[in-house]
From Swiss-Prot:
This is Transcriptional regulatory protein LytR. Keywords: Cytoplasm, DNA-binding, Phosphoprotein, Transcription, Transcription regulation, Two-component regulatory system. GO terms for cellular component: cytoplasm. The modification 4-aspartylphosphate is found at residue 53. InterPro entries: CheY-like_superfamily (IPR011006), LytR-like (IPR046947), LytTR_DNA-bd_dom (IPR007492), Sig_transdc_resp-reg_receiver (IPR001789). It is found in: Cytoplasm. The lineage of its organism: Bacteria, Bacillati, Bacillota, Bacilli, Bacillales. SUPFAM superfamilies: CheY-like (SSF52172). SMART domains: LytTR, REC. The gene is lytR. It comes from Staphylococcus aureus (strain MSSA476). Phosphorylated and dephosphorylated by LytS. GO terms for molecular function: DNA binding; phosphorelay response regulator activity.
Amino acid sequence: MKALIIDDEPLARNELTYLLNEIGGFEEINEAENVKETLEALLINQYDIIFLDVNLMDENGIELGAKIQKMKEPPAIIFATAHDQYAVQAFELNATDYILKPFGQKRIEQAVNKVRATKAKDDNSASAIANDMSANFDQSLPVEIDDKIHMLKQQNIIGIGTHNGITTIHTTNHKYETTEPLNRYEKRLNPAYFIRIHRSYIINTKHIKEVQQWFNYTYMVILTNGVKMQVGRSFMKDFKASIGLL
């Protein structure tokens, strides 16, 4: 699992990081001390669990938690604070737990186990849905170039872009150029993984390496092969939803 600790006190962040490492089972544990760092972290990573203090320097933690819950796939939120008077508000936000400082390892582990149990159930359901969606789409994409038809496995397709009448299909080990329009391929791609981010670009969300803020309040997507593709302004809402920011 991936965890994000949001607290403006370095000692509290260090203590939680230490306890989570002692509990184990975390692929990544990151920290943020304010709203800006939190939003940047959520843009880059999809977290399973967030430890959130109520009193932050620039915003109330309850208000920040409400914003996080509006994400398409919000992480589990565990409020970790020295104040007990916000517990009712926290649970109204469907918080997984509410832990008071000073932290104890057993109490933290109890909260983490709640998240793990819920995640295991959700993963099983999501896997079943993804399998159903995939069953309705071909696993390969036929690409005709000259006198050959290349059958490209969809999971190996990183992204597709078009420029000056040439459509380039980037895969994990090669790139293919054709004069077929982007729309022709878009209809054949599995929407569980592929999304159009620009009138000239389609990407496989499983191959997003990094997302950077770009001009005019848009994003630049860096794919796993290093190729960069800009998100068009009219595609921003769908893109943010696809990576869990709405």
